[in-house]
A protein has these predicted regions:
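Structural recognition of the beta-strand scaffold that forms the well-ordered cores
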Residues: 1, 8-11, 85-90, 193-197, ...
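Extracellular/periplasmic catalytic domains that process cell-envelope and extracellular macromolecules
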Residues: 1-5, 79-83, 187-190, 228, ...
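Formylglycine-dependent
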Residues: 1-105, 109, 114, 143-166
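Acidic active-site catalytic centers that drive phospho-/nucleotidyl reactions
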Residues: 7, 173, 191, 199, ...
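Phosphate/oxyanion-binding loops and surfaces in catalytic or ligand/nucleic-acid-binding neighborhoods
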Residues: 9-12, 16, 130-133, 200-204, ...
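Substrate-binding rim/cap in mid-to-C-terminal beta-strand-loop elements of soluble/periplasmic
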Residues: 17-21, 46-53, 177-181, 211, ...
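A long, amphipathic alpha-helix that forms part
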Residues: 62-79, 110-134, 154-192, 202-204, ...
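Short coil/turn segments at secondary-structure boundaries
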Residues: 137-142
Length: 274
């Protein structure tokens, strides 16, 4: 990134990684970090140095937290700049693998046992009520087996997957709160344009390389199921890696106090517009 216009950089220089330990070496008292494949080394970059297989010695390391810590340090470092500056903070959450802190997972355990069919119906109704979608919108066909066709054991396993997924998003929310608090502390809130978006729809890919380890801890490498990816993309069809709206249409939030008026738009846009 530092050869492509960024003055500073810290973080992943690849598509995804283990959230607790992006490297290949186990820390004391932990098992080997779950990986997508034994021959898959993830590139990590600190400023202009690229590291293949980065293991942070701190057992409290978690990428979403670490990215935010670095971002907040840069806000302080550049607070007296005369020119506007860009802070690009690309969290990998909630991309697989499913990794989250136990206390965050506990908030959501059991909340998804109603299943993806009911979740899709509830979200569709709420989106209609909020005016996010119009009255002519229809809920897409289910892209997986019916929730009721699963055994009780399978339902519990699926509930855990989605609880971890939700916990990952919860942690993003917590960290954005920390970041915004820092912007306000530096008295930059009124002069800061915030753009928040995701790169694609939810993912149906299944590189579950640790099928015998439940999702959540450093040793695991698990993903959500197709049914949950389908529910996450309500009301659209299909998922990431397809040309359907479930893969290509994503939310976008722009915030600038006193400049951007509250409201919604369905105007077509693309990342290149930014």
């Amino acid at each position: 990134p530092t050869t492509r216009g960024f003055a500073r950089y810290y973080g992943l220089a690849d598509g995804c990684c283990n959230f607790f330990n992006p490297g290949v070496e186990a820390r004391d008292g932990e098992g080997l970090p779950g990986r997508k494949g034994q021959n898959r080394l993830r590139r990590w970059a600190i400023e202009d140095k690229v590291i293949m297989g980065y293991t942070n010695p701190d057992k409290d390391f978690y990428t979403t937290d670490a990215f935010t810590d670095y971002a907040m340090e840069r806000l302080v470092e550049y607070k007296d700049e005369d020119k506007p500056f860009l802070l690009y903070l690309p969290y990998t959450a909630p991309h697989y693998p499913l990794h989250a802190w136990p206390e965050d997972i506990a908030k959501y355990r059991g909340k998804y046992k109603i299943g993806w069919d009911e979740i899709r119906k509830q979200r569709f109704a709420r989106m209609n009520k909020m005016g996010i979608i119009g009255p002519n919108h229809k809920l897409s066909e289910r892209a997986s087996k019916a929730w009721e066709d699963l055994s009780e054991k399978q339902k519990d396993e699926e509930d855990l997957k989605m609880a971890v997924y939700a916990a990952m998003i919860d942690r993003v929310d917590q960290n954005l709160g920390r970041l915004f608090a820092k912007v306000k502390e530096l008295k930059k809130w009124e002069n800061t344009l915030i753009l928040f978006l995701t790169d694609n729809g939810a993912c149906p890919e299944q590189p579950n390389t640790t099928p015998n380890i439940p999702p959540g801890p450093v040793e695991s490498y698990r993903t959500v199921s197709v049914g949950w990816a389908n529910a996450s993309n309500t009301p659209y069809r299909r998922f990431k890696s397809t040309d359907y709206e479930g893969g290509t249409r994503t939310p976008f939030i722009a915030h600038w106090p006193g400049v951007i008026k509250p409201g919604m738009t369905d105007q077509v846009g693309h990342i290149i517009d930014i």
